Structures are given as structure tokens and as C-alpha cells.
């Protein structure tokens, strides 16, 4: 009933938005897109009319044309990989209009972020960000979201073999990093355990965006470490005339990898529909030491969406289904595999360029039904289910008293249950609600943003345990400074954020044998919330020959929650009375004596570090690039290292780029990680070599990209410090990958 009412509200909200140009006479808008450095036509560029949400690609000669454009004032943008995104104002009358556009080559800050209240270029973001799309996404594409992103500054990969993987941002993992799909939470259980993966095929993504550092203001308390947004556009929000889409096919030699993904939008200018699907399969992969048994995986997805698109508003819905299966290597009891299934239903409405004080709005409703079973051979050991409903409304107002901003509300209902041998928790209902405010004030050479968010979360567990409530405030203030003499080619970005996170469900209630984390885990229902105070400082520069960013950060967190190992005697002294907790009998430290007891504790901690990325243009075609990141985490009272911190890392690369051709390589240099906690095993440093070539061309208004990559070209034997199986398994050996993408 709640879902039906919310869906109806979204529909009414959308159709209530007026369309000012609906009855006006229509004409054409056409022009030529050229490259600023040489005046050559720009083929395959995406030209977008913001207010009408219309888009088209340029032909081989750089020309574009829109039909049926009502009279009015519009902002027209050009998006092309490797070029600065430009927006130009144009006035369209009753006769055909012409607008020629010029794009400038951009080495690094070429994309626009959608994760902020109002989309803004990377160069002008308050926090460090990363964006992968187009040719760059093809160059980085792997079988998981985490593996695809792991070469970006500040991002590492938590793994449990090859399939279960999740991004780690600045050393923060699990419930501190939010993964969303088209702005909505994925509804899976990858944050809870290392053997649970993110149920998204990265080949099906149109783009990926990452925010490094607290993103709690807009995305909730769980984004205290950062945010990953996977954009697939299952609900069309732009007017679509005819058809547009993307197809990706990839194959790899290691593990006999293969897969494909595609999505198509078709429409008549008023109604638009989305059809999408993907599939991938990987056999047992090989390391320099040989093949890894039971390391296979497969993924299949399907999605269907539709929307009504007006002149200034839209409303639509989509349905998606994900079916996965992957093996867990190195389990002595026999072959263990997981079979995640996820149903997702979304309703979304939005409007922009509206008359009145509210100039735009966005309303979303997402329903997720997730379940996976842990299979021991053909027998079901444990079944986990997670049902989730999430809703959000954001209203953005026109400038008033110098302020431009947004106000919004958010709610979440989650029902978690585990049944079987590893039923670590009683069934738990989680209800969260929040309200937030975000404002900006701008001057010629500076912009200030500030905002606040109030979150309330209630956990209601079964099993006779008491309900637990948390109410916390998060706030942030940030500044962008553009020195006048720099002509907008140098920016100083600074932000100070107070973020609060209530304990996660697993930190409060887990109790029992958990093979996914190689532990016997002991939750603590009395844990207090984490409260962090984080500071970010970023320096960004761009010019004809160099573009780059250096960022420094520090995060002081009170009551930092982590898994602390304890002895058998400590367990007996502190937890012996809970032997029948949740109707699950304990079995000591595991019958084989191989599982360590871990209890969730909270202690004050500090994390600090630095990130840098730069591109240097030696000549018109030869470009060097470098990436560096480091993070340190310590407990304040003892100065001990925090567990599972990524090692220092540097990447050096060189590429040749001429029009649509890129050929290059890079060396990934990772330091020894011996700053460990307790009995955590250290890892040696290593260097891996990566070679690639990519070519993009336009034919018949279709953009083709072919990418070849040789990963770990020297077949280096190395271990990922954040892989829970690192003591038993090195990482994947030499792999050749071929990726073909088609956009139209």
C-alpha cells in the first residue's frame, strides 16, 4: 500500500509541472562542432539541449541537427570524451536557428558529475571525484565494479577471490561506503561480508562516478567514507526521437572470460522506452602458481523501463532482474558457492526550468528484493534475504537573497533475515528517515556551500532484543576559490564535514560462525554511533600542457567501529552467557580450531592521507600520466594501526593519442604493507605492467570503440592486501582482454 501511494504521488507531481513551450511553434536547431586546437570537425560528439532534455550525436563531418524545437532560450552542451564539457546559451525563434560549437581538449576534468544537487563539472566539485565513461571505461573494464575502479586515485578493492569484490575508498570499507545505481541504493548485502559481491555488471554501465570523502549530506550516514554511483539510465529522462543505445562485448584469456551488455532507448519525442540486458561468464582463473579451484562466476541481468517526457518534466518506471552465481575458493568443507538474486523496481519523476520559486525537482522510489543462498555442494547451508524500500524527494529553488540550493527528504525501510547454519543474526527491521538542506552562494571568484542533514534510524530485532534508536546530525561547509589571475584554470577546493554513522546491523547483532570473514563474530547492541570530522583540501590546475589535482585529507572519527580479535579465554569471560543467543549454539572457536573470535568494538581513530593525479602533454600526441595515493589509519589511544589499510601506491603511464587512437601502458607500483593490526598478515610490495591500445571511429552516426589490453603483462606473482584470501591465493596472472563498444 505504501508503495502504491508513493508511486501515485510521483505521477501526480510530474504531471502537475507546467510545460511553457508545449503549444509554441517548432523549428530546427543545427550547427557544426569543431575541435578548438585544430579546427577539425568533431565526429560522434553528444550534443544536448539541457532544458528540453534532447540529445543527438554529430555526424562524421561534425554536423548536428535537432527537429521540432519550440521557440525559447536554451543551454546547449557538448559532451565528448577527452574534451571539456561546454554549455552555450542560444535563443531560438520561429525560424531555423544555427549554433556552431567548439570543444577544447581536456586531459583530466572532462566530465560532469550527477551526484551533486545540481550537476557540475569535475573541475568545480567541492570534493575529489573520479568519472569513468566512454573510451576510459573500456580501458578499465573488469568483471566487477571494484576491479573496474581500482586504478582511480584513493580507491582500492576488497576481495574474496575474483567475484565477490567491493570498492574501498581512502581505507574505508563496508557500511562506510555507499554504492548506488542511478542514485538509489543497490539493496544487496555486499557491505556485510567479504564473500558478498555487488550485483551489478560494470559492462552494463554508461558511466561510473566516485566521490572520495564524506557524502553524507545527500546520501545518508553510510556515505561517511564516500560514494560510488553506477549510471545505467534505466528510466529515460531525456526526450527520445528514434533510437539510441550502447552495446559492449568483452572477452579475456584468463579464466576464459566472456560477456556482453546492451541497452537501447526508443521513443517518439513524448514516450521513451528502455530495454537492457547483460551476461558474463568466467571459469576458474589462473595465478602464476596455477589454476584456482572453484573461482568461477557468472552474471545475467535484464531491465525494462519507460517514461513520459514533457517539455520540462518526466515520469517513468523500470524493472530490473539480476541472477548471479560464483564459487568461493579455499574452503575445506567442500565446494561452496553463492547464488544472489535481485529484483529491483523504480519509479522516478523530475522537472527542470520550471516557473516559480521551485525551479526543479526530483522524486524517486526504489524497491529491492534481494536473496542469496550459500550452497555447500547441492545443499543449502544458509539463506540471506534483504527487502528494501527507499524514497527521496529533492526540491531546488531559484536564487533568493544570493542563495541557490535544495531541500529534501529521504526514507528507508529494510527487512533483513538469515536462515540456516550461518544465521548470524535474528530477523531485523530497519527504518530510517532524514531531511536535508543544501545552499550555495557565489561571488566572481569564490563559491561557498553549506548544508545539514538530520537522520533518524531505528533497528527492531526479533529474538527478545530491545529496539535501538539513533538520531544524528551531519553538516558540511565548503569553498571553491578561483584566483582572478588564473582565468579559471586554477581552483582551490576545501571542505569541512561533520558526519555521523549509526552502527550497522551486523555490528550490532551478528553472533556466530562466519566463514565469509574467516571469523566467529560477536556484535554489540550497545555500540554508540561513529562521529567523524573530516577536512579535505584539493588544488586543481589545467592548461594546454598539464592538468592535475593534489588532495590532502584528514578524518578524526570518535567510536570508530571495527572487528577486534579476542582469545578463547576472553570470549568465555565476556560472552559465555550468550551461548544460546538467537537460538544459535556456539561451537567454540570452530571445530577445527581455525576461526578466530572477533568482537565489534568502538575506539577513537584518525585517518589521513594524500592523493594526486596528473596528465602532462609532452607533445601534441604524447601524454604522460601519474597517480599516487596513500592513507594511514591509527587508534588514538595506543597509536596502533587500523586493520586492513591499503598500502601506498603509485601509477606511472605513457600514452600516444591522435584523434580516436590511443596506445599506451602503465606500471602499477605498490608498497609493502607492514603497518598491520594484531595478527593481520603483512604483504610484500610489487610492480605490475599494463599495456593497451584503443581506437574509436564514427561510421553511419555510430561510435565504435575497440580496446585491447594486456594486464599483468609480466605475469607477476603478487597479493592484494585487502583480499581476505591473500594468505592462500595470489592475484590473477597474465590476462589479455578485448573490448568492443558501439554507441548510437
Walk through the language-model features, giving the residues of each.
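Outer membrane beta-barrel strand-and-loop segments of large Gram-negative receptors
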Residues: 305, 382-395, 434-436, 528, ...
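Gram-negative outer-membrane beta-barrel transporters
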Residues: 403-405, 445-449, 554-556, 581-673, ...
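Conserved C-terminal beta-signal and adjacent last beta-strands/turns
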Residues: 300, 307-310, 352, 490-494, ...
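Outer-membrane beta-barrel translocator/receptor signature
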Residues: 204-207, 212, 217-288, 295-301, ...
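Short acidic/polar hinge/loop motifs at secondary-structure boundaries
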Residues: 185-214
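Short, acidic, small-residue-rich periplasmic hinge/interaction motif at the N-terminus
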Residues: 34, 50, 79-83, 93-138, ...
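Surface-exposed extracellular loop regions of Gram-negative outer-membrane beta-barrel proteins
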Residues: 323, 332, 369, 415, ...
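Flexible loop and strand-edge segments within Gram-negative outer membrane beta-barrel domains
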Residues: 282-283, 288-289, 293-299, 313-388, ...
Amino acid at each position: 500500500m505504501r508503495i502504491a501511494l508513493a508511486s501515485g504521488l510521483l505521477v501526480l507531481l510530474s504531471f502537475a509541472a507546467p510545460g511553457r513551450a508545449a503549444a509554441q511553434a517548432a523549428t530546427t536547431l543545427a550547427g557544426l562542432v569543431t575541435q578548438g586546437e585544430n579546427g577539425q570537425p568533431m565526429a560522434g560528439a553528444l550534443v544536448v539541449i539541457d532544458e528540453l532534455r534532447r540529445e543527438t550525436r554529430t555526424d562524421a563531418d561534425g554536423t548536428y541537427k535537432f527537429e521540432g524545437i519550440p521557440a525559447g532560450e536554451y543551454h546547449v552542451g557538448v559532451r565528448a570524451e577527452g574534451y571539456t564539457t561546454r554549455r552555450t546559451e542560444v535563443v531560438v525563434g520561429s525560424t531555423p536557428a544555427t549554433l556552431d560549437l567548439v570543444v577544447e581538449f581536456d586531459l583530466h576534468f572532462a566530465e560532469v558529475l550527477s551526484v551533486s544537487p545540481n550537476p557540475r563539472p569535475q573541475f568545480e566539485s567541492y570534493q575529489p571525484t573520479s568519472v569513468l565513461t566512454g573510451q576510459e571505461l573500456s580501458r578499465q573494464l573488469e568483471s566487477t565494479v571494484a576491479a573496474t575502479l581500482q586504478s582511480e586515485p584513493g580507491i582500492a578493492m576488497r576481495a574474496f577471490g575474483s567475484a565477490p569484490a567491493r570498492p574501498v575508498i581512502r581505507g574505508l570499507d563496508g557500511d562506510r561506503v555507499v554504492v548506488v545505481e542511478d542514485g538509489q541504493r543497490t539493496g544487496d548485502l555486499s557491505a556485510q561480508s567479504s564473500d558478498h559481491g555487488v550485483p551489478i555488471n560494470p559492462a552494463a554501465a554508461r558511466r561510473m562516478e566516485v566521490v572520495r570523502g564524506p557524502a553524507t549530506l545527500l546520501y545518508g550516514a553510510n556515505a561517511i567514507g564516500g560514494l560510488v554511483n553506477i549510471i545505467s539510465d534505466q528510466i529515460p529522462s531525456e526526450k527520445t526521437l528514434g533510437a539510441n543505445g550502447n552495446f559492449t562485448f568483452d572477452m579475456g584469456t584468463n579464466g576464459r572470460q566472456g560477456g556482453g551488455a546492451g541497452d537501447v532507448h526508443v521513443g517518439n519525442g513524448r514516450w521513451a522506452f528502455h530495454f537492457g540486458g547483460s551476461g558474463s561468464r568466467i571459469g576458474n582463473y589462473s595465478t602464476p602458481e596455477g589454476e584456482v579451484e572453484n573461482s568461477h562466476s557468472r552474471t545475467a541481468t535484464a531491465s525494462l523501463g519507460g517514461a513520459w517526457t514533457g517539455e520540462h518534466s518526466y515520469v517513468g518506471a523500470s524493472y530490473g532482474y539480476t541472477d548471479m552465481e560464483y564459487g568461493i575458493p579455499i574452503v575445506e568443507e567442500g565446494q561452496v558457492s553463492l547464488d544472489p538474486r535481485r529484483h529491483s523496481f523504480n519509479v522516478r519523476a523530475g522537472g527542470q526550468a520550471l516557473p516559480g520559486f521551485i525551479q526543479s525537482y526530483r522524486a524517486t522510489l526504489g524497491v529491492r528484493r534481494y536473496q542469496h543462498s550459500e550452497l555447500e555442494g547441492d545443499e543449502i547451508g544458509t539463506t540471506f534475504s534483504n527487502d528494501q524500500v527507499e524514497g527521496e524527494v529533492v526540491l531546488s529553488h531559484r536564487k533568493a537573497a544570493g542563495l541557490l540550493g535544495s531541500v529534501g527528504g529521504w526514507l528507508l525501510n529494510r527487512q533483513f533475515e538469515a536462515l540456516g547454519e550461518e544465521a548470524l543474526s535474528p530477523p531485523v527491521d530497519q527504518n530510517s528517515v532524514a531531511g536535508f538542506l543544501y545552499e550555495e552562494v557565489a561571488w566572481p571568484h569564490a563559491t561557498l556551500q553549506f548544508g545539514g542533514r538530520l537522520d533518524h534510524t531505528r533497528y527492531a530485532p526479533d529474538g527478545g532484543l530491545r529496539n535501538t534508536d539513533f538520531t544524528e546530525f551531519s553538516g558540511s561547509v565548503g569553498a571553491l576559490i578561483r584566483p582572478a589571475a588564473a582565468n579559471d584554470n586554477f581552483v582551490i577546493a576545501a571542505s569541512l564535514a561533520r558526519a555521523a554513522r549509526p552502527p550497522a546491523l551486523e555490528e550490532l547483532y551478528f553472533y556466530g560462525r562466519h566463514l565469509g570473514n574467516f571469523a566467529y563474530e560477536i556484535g554489540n547492541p550497545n555500540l554508540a554511533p561513529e562521529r567523524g570530522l573530516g577536512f579535505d583540501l584539493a588544488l586543481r590546475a589545467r592548461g594546454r600542457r598539464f592538468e592535475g589535482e593534489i588532495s590532502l585529507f584528514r578524518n578524526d572519527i570518535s567510536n570508530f567501529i571495527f572487528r577486534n580479535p579476542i582469545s578463547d579465554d576472553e570470549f568465555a569471560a565476556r560472552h559465555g552467557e550468550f551461548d544460546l543467543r538467537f537460538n544459535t549454539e556456539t561451537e567454540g572457536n570452530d571445530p577445527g580450531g581455525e576461526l578466530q573470535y572477533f568482537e565489534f568494538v568502538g575506539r577513537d581513530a584518525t585517518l589521513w592521507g594524500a592523493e594526486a593525479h596528473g596528465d602532462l602533454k609532452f607533445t601534441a600526441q604524447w601524454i604522460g600520466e601519474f597517480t599516487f595515493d596513500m592513507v594511514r589509519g591509527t587508534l588514538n589511544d595506543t597509536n596502533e594501526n587500523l586493520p586492513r589499510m591499503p598500502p601506498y601506491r603509485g601509477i606511472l603511464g605513457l600514452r600516444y593519442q591522435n584523434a580516436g587512437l590511443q596506445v599506451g601502458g602503465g606500471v602499477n607500483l605498490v608498497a609493502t604493507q607492514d603497518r598491520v593490526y594484531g595478527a593481520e598478515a603483512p604483504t610484500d610490495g610489487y610492480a605490475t605492467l599494463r599495456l593497451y591500445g584503443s581506437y574509436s571511429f564514427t561510421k553511419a552516426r555510430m561510435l565504435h570503440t575497440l580496446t585491447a589490453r594486456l594486464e599483468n603483462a609480466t605475469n607477476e606473482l603478487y597479493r592484494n592486501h585487502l583480499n581476505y584470501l591473500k594468505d592462500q591465493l595470489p592475484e590473477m596472472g597474465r590476462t589479455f582482454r578485448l573490448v568492443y563498444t558501439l554507441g548510437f
